[in-house]
Amino acid sequence: MAAKPTAKRETFRHGNLPEALVDAALARLEADGVEAISLRDLARDAGVNHRAVYRHFPDKLSLRALDAERGWQGLALRLKNATASKAPGEPALVAASVAFFQCARDFPNLFHLMSGARVNVEGEFPTLEAAIIDALQVFAVGFAGTGMAPGIVVERTALFVAALQGVVTQILHHRLKVAPPKAKAFIADACRMLIKGVS
C-alpha cells in the first residue's frame, strides 16, 4: 500500500500534478459544492505536500478558474455534438439548449460555478474566457442561421443564453417544477419562446 503514493508523486514530478488536482477539485465540487474546495485537502487527495499544490495554483481562485474552464470546454463539446446534424437556426438552437440543460443537470455544482459570479473579473484567465466564447459561439451561429441581422447576433445571443441560464437554474433549484421525463420538452418549448423574444 505504501508504494502507491510514492509512484503517484513520481508521475506528478513529470508534469501531471495540475491535471490530477483539477480532477480532484471537480470531484469535490460535485460532491460538496464549490466552497468545499480546499487546496490542502486536494493535496491530501493527490498524495502530495501542500507546497506542491501552491506551485501550480497560488490560490483557490486560480483553481476555480481552471475548473470552470474545464466545464466550459465540456459544454462546448456537448453543444457542438448536439448541433452537428441540425439545420441552422431554430433546430440548432433547440438542440443546443437541450444539451445546455443536460450538462447542467449532470454537473449541477460545476454549472453553478460556471454560471455564477464571474471568475475572470480581472482578466487573469484568458484561456477561461476563450473556452466561454467557444461554447457560446454555437448559439451565435444558431442565431445567424435564423437570418438575424449580423450586427445584433452577439448581443441577442448573450440575452438568450442569460435567459436560458435563468430557466435552467430555476429547474435545478426546484423553483420551476418540471418532472424529469418532461424536462427536455420543457426546455425546447422555452427555447422557442426565447428565440421569439430576442428576434
Residue ranges and their predicted role:
Residues 1-16, 27:
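N-terminal intrinsically disordered/low-complexity leader segments
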Residues 161-179, 194-199:
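Amphipathic C-terminal alpha-helical segment
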Residues 17-25, 42, 67-75, 79:
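Generic hydrophobic, amphipathic alpha-helix propensity
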Residues 20, 28-62, 66:
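Helix-turn-helix
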Residues 105-123, 169-177:
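Amphipathic alpha-helical segments used for helix-helix packing
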Residues 79, 103, 121-147, 154-159, ...:
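Amphipathic alpha-helical packing segments from all-alpha helical-bundle domains
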Residues 66, 80-109, 132-134, 150, ...:
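Hydrophobic alpha-helical connector segments
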